[in-house]
């Protein structure tokens, strides 16, 4: 295609064109070379005419404006009632808002009342349901105990408890309990069906949580240490004076504030309750209104599904909903892009505003201290009250003027209203007047707009006579030889131009086809070049990314190496510091232990010396006592020897008497000495002991203070050393970390700047390239679009012409068909209507005849049934059914009562014979144990199985019995009953009979070995007689 050539053969009759152009040139040469037109300069006349027009227009505007202003001024008093009405409208908004607020308050009262009712219902329901749930739980516990019990006595006791618990419940409570048990059973079945997957889920979740918790152990330890630190900080904080002041403030003010806010809450609650009561009627009405509205909503919503219009609406929304969302998305994106485009301008504006506000701040800060600003403030203080006073007086004047103008305004308003009413009625009765006014206004405006143009044209060109002359000259030239030749030349020129246009169009079409072909080749080449460029850019971006990643990796490796070395050095330093602190702590502990040992040894030595001295003193006292006792004994022996002979002579009685007297006399005689000596000895001993104890305590206190001082000094020294070392480590670590951080920041910033530079370069290149491509394609597209548009317009024009022809043809044909069909349809409709009316009349007459005959028959039947019913009721009136039923029941009761003794004796004989027979046949030694552990248990199990197995049969029998007991009685409409025999009499008679019919239940107890082994209940007489009837 690149070597193809475009060849076009153009056939043009140039000679004919040249011949025609020569004729035109000859005509031109025969025309005069110069044409002189006399033009008068009429600028002064134009200016005068314009000034005159301006004066007239201004005068008219002034006069009309003055008239309108006068009319408005005369109607100004009408503004007073209008303003009053406006005030009334605004004031009416208040009651409207009050009504709305009252309705809202009433609705709130209704909601609150409903809420209180719901709470009360919930409380009562919780109480009632709680009793049932508690009974269910107790039954479950007793059932569990029964399942675990192995002893028959214990099982019987549990069964008795279950029976008592069930008997303590009411009818509805038992029903609710049964329903609850059924629900629990159903829930257990559901739980069992989904137990395995739930447990697997639970196991998986626990394992997951376990792994997560194990991974979070460092966090937990850190949190624990942090909590400990916070606790210590909190402890120190609560020791601060401000916290003590706060606690004192709470101790003083909290009780009063609590009481005050409690009273406030109580008052608010009482207010709300009073408001609820006050708004109760309104709330009731609001509730009923809302209930009716919601019922209407339900009906409306129920009919929406079958509504064709609603389905059309849904279809419309489904069709146009995405369009709306797309519109919103486009608007959002467009606004975001627009704001993004305005972002630089907004930044500049905000920068300018920052500078402006900063200058304003500086000016305001300097203005408040300036003399001029203070003078301005003083001026405002002086003249401000005067201004406000003047405004108040002006307002009062305007108010008084409005009050004075109110009567006049009312009359003027009536006049304006009458005029407006007249104009409205006139324009309504005669619309031509309104049309005439509209046309007059439009013509006036057009005349006002065209008058300056007309006057200007007339003034400049001397009126319209010159235009008439020019038109006459053109007409004469058209009929002259020169005009005819010129017209022929113009016609030939049109023909030549048309021929050349067709040739140019054919050439353009051929060129356009060639251009499209070339554009296709160019597009193929362009796509190839774009693919090559994209591959190149891809390689360039990949290489840049690889270089960036390599640089980041190198920087990260370097940083990691530095950080690793720093962490290793820091770790080693911390280990060494820990060892040093450990050694210092061990040395301090050893020093403290040695000091304690020395103090303990010194204390032990002092205590040992004191104990030795105390033992020696005690030993001396004992020796002194022993010696004193020996002297006393010797003196007593001498005295005894001296008085022995005299005592022997006295006899036993004298001996005893003399000994007692001597002893008493000796004690009395030496009492003061004994007391004084004893006190002296004890005082010396106690003083010595006290002095020794004080010396020991003083020595121990000195030793303890020295020990405490030594330990404190050692601890302070160790603390100071550790703090200094830690601060050094922290400072070095901070400097190293800041260096690493600064280095990494500089490396990262360099990488970011390099990436930004590369990105900006790529962006600039691609932006220029894309703009070039966009411009090229835009030019090509515009050319293609123009050509296609022209072709399309031609096709549309032809299509419109064809469509209009078809539309007119089918319209006329359809109108003819419609007219024909309408004529036929009207004839058919008339005939069918006549036939239908005749049929309807015949059917109506037939139905009325049938209705009258059936009504007569039914009336006769009804009268017959009434007579039969009255006869029956009159028969039963003469019979006392109550006494007859009472006598029958009483006879049955007497018969059963007379036979009761034989029944009990028979049962007694049976009960006496049963134990002996059972013991003899079965060899039973303890019937109670056998009946309790084996027979009773198996009888109960058999009864349970039998009742459960025959439950369906019993249900069907009961249903059949109920169905047969209630026969279907046909309904007789309009059945009249004799009013003299009331239903209350029949009900009273039946109730009286049934009261005598009921009998108490009879308990039958079966005993074996003087123990109760069974119990039966004899049902009322009806069942008893039924059983007798069955035996027969």
Curated annotation (Swiss-Prot):
Keywords of this entry: Coiled coil, Viral release from host cell, Viral tail assembly, Virion
Entry's Gene Ontology cellular component terms: virion component
Subcellular location, record wording: Virion
Name assigned to this protein: Tail tape measure protein gp18
Broad class of the protein's primary localization: virion
Role, per record: Serves as a base for tail tube protein polymerization and acts as a template for tail length determination.
Top-level taxonomy: Viruses, Duplodnaviria, Heunggongvirae, Uroviricota, Caudoviricetes
Native source organism of the sequence: Bacillus phage SPP1
Coiled coil: 131-178
Keyword Coiled coil: yes
GO terms under biological process: viral tail assembly
Superkingdom of origin: Viruses
